[in-house]
Every structure is written in structure tokens, then in C-alpha cells.
Amino acid sequence: YRLYGEAVVKAAVENGSSHVDISGEPAWIESMQMKYSEQAKEKGVFIVSACGWDSIPCDMGMEFLKKNFDGTLTYAETFAKINTGESGYSFNAGTYQTLILGIWKAKDDGLGRIRKAIMPEKLEKTRWRAPKRSTFWYNDKLKCYCLPFLGADKSIVQRSQYFDAQMDKKFPAMIETYICVKSGFWALALLAWLMIFQIAVKFSWTRNILQKYPDICSAYMFKNSGPTRQQAEEATFEYWFFGTGWNETTIPPPVEEQPNKKVVVRCDGPDAGYIATSGCVLSGVFTSAAAFKNTKIYDRLASFGIVFRTVPEMAST
């Protein structure tokens, strides 16, 4: 999308056609809002990005959590778990190439400037934030090791919360996103690979090698062919939301009081890369939650096996 997506968005807006995509690149997504939001409003069309696995489960999960909190949500921690079958799993190299471009062009994106343009108003915040976590830590509730999730989910949710606050006058919730890895060894291996990968991307000769040999350079975590049909059929995902806030629904909420309520939401679905992503693509410039929250999206997602539900809070061990 960074290389070719703008031409499609521009053509859609100019010709009065709405546009839905499965992009996962925050800089591109937010620059499209900055450039085309007003024109889209004038034309009466919708530009809705990140409608694949990035970031329907997370964005709509946060919306589901807020709707079912029965109080005021102040922050949430989210955890994505990819469950593979006996055949293993390889992600498509397109995601890998996007990651290379994202890291390489990060300094030139001007993301801070873009965000000031599309979200000029400061949102109300409280001193109650999600716990500070180390880069690598063990989640004793989900029985997995956690690393920061580098996808678009956090930025998409932040924009949805801004829209919620500005348009619907709802208290904005903060979010921290993580990816779960089953073993400490593989979590450390993934962390080490990411560190080396980020350094290698900065130099043209190593970047060319990374781009040319995605399978070898990622230890076959990414392949040009993507997962096999059997791998996709065996794979599933879980997305967990641990919300914290207050029982009260007053506006403004009792921000000086310590949060007194917790709600847990779980989303389950099939293979994230293909089956869930195709199910997520549903029929100004919006996030998925801003565009779809008052529709029958949850029923639509359920028909593809992507189900949201509240679950009892789990105790730490």
C-alpha cells in the first residue's frame, strides 16, 4: 500500500466510490486520512483501512469491550495468539516486505506531523495507565511469553478512540498491544531476529539480501508462497482484551479514584493470514470501529468464525 495504494484511494474518492482495504501500515493509512478526508466527506464516500486481521479483531474487540464494560473503560491490554497445527505455519512474504519498507522509511514518514494534523485536539487522560512491561515478559494468566505487537493495531485503536471522543463524546480508552509466544526460547529468538532485522534494513546491501531471500532471512517464518492450504486450515487465533476502569458511567468519570472494575473479552477465529482476513473485509476516512460499530458487523464476523465474547477474569498464579 505504501508504494501503490494512494493511486487507488485517490481514484476512489475522485469518482465517488467508497474504498475498503486490508492495509497494515500506520504511516500510509494516516497520511491517506490527512490528504483525502475532506474530499471524501464532500463526495459522501468512506475510506476504511486496516479491515483485515490488522486491525478488525483488535479495533472491534476494543469497541466490544467498551460496549460490554457496563462502566467506563480507562485502559486495556491486548494479546494476540497465533495457534498453528502440526504442519507449522509460514506467513506470506508480502507482510515481510512491508515490514522492511516500514522500518526503512520510518524517519521520512513524518508520522508525528501527520498525527498532529488528523488529531489536533488533546484527549482527556488519567494517571491510571496500563502497567509498564519489559520488552520480554511472562503472562501468567495466558501462560505465554509476551513481546510488543509491532502491527498497526495500537495506532488504529488510538484513532478510533479519538473519533469516539470527538464525535460521540465518549471517554477515550488507552491501549497497549502484545503478541504471545508459547516458549521463552522462541520469544527470545524472535526478539533477537527483530533486533538484527532492524539493523540490517538500514544498509542497502543487507536490505537487498533481506528483500531477495525472505524465506532464508526469516528462517522460513515468511515465504513467497505463504502458508499451505493445510497450514491455513489447521491454524487459529485468539485475541484477548483485559480492560480496566470504573463501575461509574458518569461524564466525566471519577478519574481521581483508583479503577475498581475489570472485564475480559476474548476473540477467536480461524487462520489470521487468509481465512480471518477475508472474513474481515466487509462489504470522510475512518477506522473500522468508527465506520462499522453501529452495524451488524459482529454477526457478519461470526458467520466467518470470528467470535467475540466476555469471559470470567483469570487469576494470576
Regions found by a protein language model. Give the residues of each.
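Active-site Tyr-X1-5-Lys
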Residues: 32-39, 60-69
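C-terminal catalytic/substrate-binding lobe primarily of soluble NAD(P)-dependent oxidoreductases
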Residues: 44, 66-317
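Short beta-strand elements at the ligand-binding edges of bilobed clamshell
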Residues: 45-51
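Rossmann-fold NAD(P)-binding glycine/threonine-rich loop
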Residues: 3-10, 23-45
